[in-house]
Design a protein with these regions (language model features):
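N-terminal domain-onset segments
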Residues: 1-98, 102-178, 185-204
Length: 204
């Protein structure tokens, strides 16, 4: 999964119709892997909100689906970067924390979203890093509660089929996944890279 980011370049305009300097996207389209591009206005309204929001995804999912949502950690480990990751300014051999989670309804057990993160832990305070490693809390909530100055920059949005590797939804049937990749800038440096995927059939 980390390899997904290795061939990306800093100029992300082609994959992101939601850049702030471009204004309202209007009739923009997003890419569908292996198929025709999709006009953004055809996406369910709440999914459009999720693609552009700058806040805690867990809380907005709770408000929309009206049940508690928990972060279920599926994978978390330190790995050396095999190749450069331009979006994070990571060099080969640099140690990063990779993390894969599901955002699941506590009562329904439905997986509303899946997220994969690459984190440069050496660039965050020790207390933040330890809470992250201990899996005590989600990244968005942790940043909010830490009081650190940060902002999110959306880099890429698109639609791809679920293939069992990118984000299994535990649903009775496979679903197209609407995704966004963004990075979190802290103290002027890219520190966290996250791809969130949302099963389309749950939001239609």
């Amino acid at each position: 999964m980390v390899r997904r980011y290795c061939d990306k370049i800093e100029d992300t305009g082609a994959g992101n119709p939601f850049q702030c300097h471009q204004g309202f996207p209007g009739d923009a389209r997003i890419r569908r892997a292996g198929g025709a591009d999709v006009p953004i206005h055809e996406l369910p309204p709440f999914l459009r909100v999720l693609l552009v929001m700058d806040g805690t995804v867990t809380k907005i999912l709770e408000a929309y689906f009206w049940e508690p949502v928990e972060v279920v950690t599926l994978r978390q480990e330190f790995v050396p970067a095999e190749r450069p990751i331009p979006w994070l300014r990571v060099d080969p051999g640099e140690r990063v924390l990779v993390r894969r989670v599901h955002l699941s309804g506590v009562e329904s057990k439905r997986v509303y979203a899946a997220a994969f993160s690459v984190i440069r832990t050496q660039l965050v305070p020790e207390a933040f890093r330890q809470q992250l490693i201990d899996r005590r809390i989600g990244i968005g909530v942790l940043i909010r509660d830490s009081g650190m100055e940060s902002y999110r920059e959306v880099l890429e949005v698109g639609i791809e089929p679920e293939d069992g590797n990118n984000a299994p939804t535990l649903a009775p049937k496979k679903s197209d996944l609407v995704f966004r990749t963004y990075r979190i800038i802290i103290d002027g440096k890219p520190v966290i890279l996250i791809t969130e995927r949302f099963p389309l059939h749950l939001y239609g």
